[in-house]
């Protein structure tokens, strides 16, 4: 009798990938990176185990916003104080804090559970070309073929 393969947390082989976000649409980038963080690209994917890889996103400041999203899409946050609702457009958000915008978009596509938070910790986003994870010897991943 055959049984479905279920990965164990200690048996997962993780890789490090570098993704260049230059000129790629934000949503397409986020969905592809979220899939890699979950491990959906592996044959050993198990829904209840974190089987994903580490991802480093570089050039987050040069991600592309299509259509009128730069002026029409509004991000809201609240300080939990009366009258503390803050808002800013996607264009302002991208100009002031591109790392946080890309990270927030990718984490929004992960499961909203404790396992999803663990998956989100494997994401590293940088606005420019350089990153601090050279010691991990990350592979360059061209996601234009995966989109």
From Swiss-Prot:
Gene3D superfamilies: Ribosomal protein L13 (3.90.1180.10)
Any one GO biological process: negative regulation of translation
Subunit structure as annotated in this protein's UniProt entry: Part of the 50S ribosomal subunit.
Pfam family, one: Ribosomal_L13
GO molecular function, one term: structural constituent of ribosome
GO cellular component, one term: cytosolic large ribosomal subunit
Gene: rplM
Name of protein: Large ribosomal subunit protein uL13
Keyword set includes Ribosomal protein: yes
CDD domains assigned: Ribosomal_L13
Described purpose of this protein according to its UniProt entry: This protein is one of the early assembly proteins of the 50S ribosomal subunit, although it is not seen to bind rRNA by itself. It is important during the early stages of 50S assembly.
Keywords: Ribonucleoprotein, Ribosomal protein
Family: Belongs to the universal ribosomal protein uL13 family.
Matching InterPro entries: Ribosomal_uL13 (IPR005822), Ribosomal_uL13_bac-type (IPR005823), Ribosomal_uL13_CS (IPR023563), Ribosomal_uL13_sf (IPR036899)
Transmembrane segments: none
